[in-house]
């Protein structure tokens, strides 16, 4: 093999090993519409001037965010989507990406190259994994209809403009650890890619309960957010209505008592009719016996008449 080829291969292997050994991987997080920090810490900065280096960042699609070429910003190779959105901190070797959007999530590479008279040598590569978060709005409970005597309560809870996708939303009610909710819905904005969530609940006052407190809870991967508590009080009956109900109840009770007395009074009189019939039969029997006795005395009466004459 040609010695020059051998030397070239050795240099290539050396540069590759150097690149792998000096590769750095970091994770960073930014808020939606905020600023992301993409570090590129250079351990050899004390020995090499920035004017001797080429430093640039590119995204996972190989689009250039920023390039610092031998001490000067170079905008020719910067992609249009990143123009005006970046600033370079020379002291910390960090690129600031402004106005971060959900679509900016992903991996970014920073390359530091030395520019010798011929060619270039990669001195360091830093891989940054960027995640973007957006705080959901505080859950808000809205009443769908007014609370009246025995009517149900229809509630809706909403929270908007958050990221990443929420896990769930539910209602909590006084003195209960159960999670309530009838219809949880999650939607995502096509432009901002932020999520909104809502849930609804229909409930009524249990018997004997006059007060209830309801709270809506949004649960994400990292936190729980609660709404302001909403208090409900069922209206007590007015005094006039109360006394009307009492009067009606007492009247019904008296009518029932009177009806019961009448029924009980009639039952013992029913068997008295046969006793009247029996006494009549007894009187008829006595009359018959008297008739029979008179017939037996007729001969005696007849014989006594001549003597009397």
Curated annotation (Swiss-Prot):
Homodimer. Interacts with MARCH8. Interacts (via cytoplasmic domain) with PHB1 and PHB2; the interactions increases after priming with CD40. Interacts with CD28. Disulfide bonds join 40-110, 157-216. Coiled coil: none annotated. Polyubiquitinated; which is promoted by MARCH8 and results in endocytosis and lysosomal degradation. The chain crosses the membrane at residues 245-265. This is T-lymphocyte activation antigen CD86. Residues 33-128 form the Ig-like V-type domain. Residues 24-244 are extracellular. Residues 269-309 are annotated as: Disordered. The lineage of its organism: Eukaryota, Metazoa, Chordata, Craniata, Vertebrata. Expressed on activated B-cells. It holds the Pfam family V-set. Residues 150-223 form the Ig-like C2-type domain. GO terms for biological process: adaptive immune response; B cell activation; cellular response to lipopolysaccharide; defense response to virus; positive regulation of immunoglobulin production; positive regulation of non-canonical NF-kappaB signal transduction; positive regulation of T cell proliferation; toll-like receptor 3 signaling pathway. Residues 1-23 form the signal peptide. Glycans are attached at residues 33, 47, 92, 135, 146, 154, 175, 190, 231. PANTHER family: T-LYMPHOCYTE ACTIVATION ANTIGEN (PTHR25466), T-LYMPHOCYTE ACTIVATION ANTIGEN CD86 (PTHR25466:SF2). Its main location: membrane. One of its GO terms (cellular component) is external side of plasma membrane. It comes from Mus musculus. Residues 280-298 have a biased composition (Basic and acidic residues). It is a single-pass type I membrane protein. InterPro entries: CD86_IgV (IPR037677), Ig-like_dom (IPR007110), Ig-like_dom_sf (IPR036179), Ig-like_fold (IPR013783), Ig_V-set (IPR013106), T-cell_Activation_Regulation (IPR051713). Gene3D superfamilies: Immunoglobulins.
